[in-house]
Structure formats: C-alpha cells, structure tokens
Amino acid sequence: SGSCQLKTCWQVTPDFRTVGTLLKHKFYNATLIKAHNRNTGQVEHAHHHPHRRKSSAGELVFFEESPNFCESEPKLDSAGTRGRICNKTSPGLDNCESLCCGRGHNILRQTRQERCNCKF
C-alpha cells in the first residue's frame, strides 16, 4: 500500500487591529501625486524630490488634499466644527480635543429642574 500526502494552502486575514495599524501607517505615509494629462497613465510626485523612488504597488497615493473639516467650507457644504457642542469626558469623536480642532472650548454648566414622574 502506498502513502498519501495532502497539502492544503490558504490565506488567513490578519486580525482587525493588525489591519487597522497597517492602514493607519500607510495613510500617514501616503504620497501626493499629480497625473500627467498625456493619456500615458504616468504620474509624478507633486512635491518633487530627486531622491524619491517610484510609488510601490502597496503604497497609498492621493491626487488632492483632504478638506479641513474643522473650518467652514461652503463649496463642500461643510459647516465646520466651530460652535458645536462637545463632550469633555467622551473618548469618542464628540470629545472636545477632537471636535474643537485645538481651538479650545468654553464650559457651560447648567442646572435644570425636570419633572421625573417619580412614584413613592
């Protein structure tokens, strides 16, 4: 009787944190490029650096800067974040450090009386 060997290869997606960390690193190291208008498919780095190599296949590149969502931009229908209410203790996107874009914030303390319809 003969022996039989079976090999199976498969790819497994890394855990979510690993993927997120990799994407964040690629995002912060992305390169601004500009396309030539010659239908050649060629692109060049917008900030010409003689020592800069060509972009690699796994590198993130972008054609235009992202808008500054902190400031009002009527053309983009963006009201900005000035005057928005933030949550000083929140770890989320509504926290004051993130939402106020480093401009600082005012603290508003309120005391309210509300009917609670309590039953004793």
From Swiss-Prot:
The answer to whether UniProt assigns keyword Ubl conjugation to this entry is no
Q: How is it modified after translation?
A: Palmitoleoylation is required for efficient binding to frizzled receptors. Depalmitoleoylation leads to Wnt signaling pathway inhibition.
Q: What is a single molecular function from GO for this protein?
A: frizzled binding
Q: Provide the leader sequence positions.
A: none
Q: Which family does it belong to?
A: Belongs to the Wnt family.
InterPro entries reported for this sequence: Wnt, Wnt_C
Q: Which cysteines are joined by disulfide bonds?
A: C86-C101
| One Gene Ontology CC term in the entry | extracellular space
Query: What residues bear carbohydrate chains?
Result: N29, N87
* SMART domains referenced in this protein's UniProt entry, alphabetically: WNT1
- Keywords associated with the record: Developmental protein, Disulfide bond, Extracellular matrix, Glycoprotein, Lipoprotein, Secreted, Wnt signaling pathway
Q: Does the keyword Cell wall biogenesis/degradation apply?
A: no
Name-wise, this protein is Protein Wnt-10a
Q: Which cellular compartments is it found in?
A: Secreted, Extracellular space, Extracellular matrix; Secreted
What does the entry give for GO biological process? canonical Wnt signaling pathway; cell fate commitment; neuron differentiation
Q: What does this protein do?
A: Ligand for members of the frizzled family of seven transmembrane receptors. Required for normal tooth development. Regulates the expression of genes involved in tooth development.
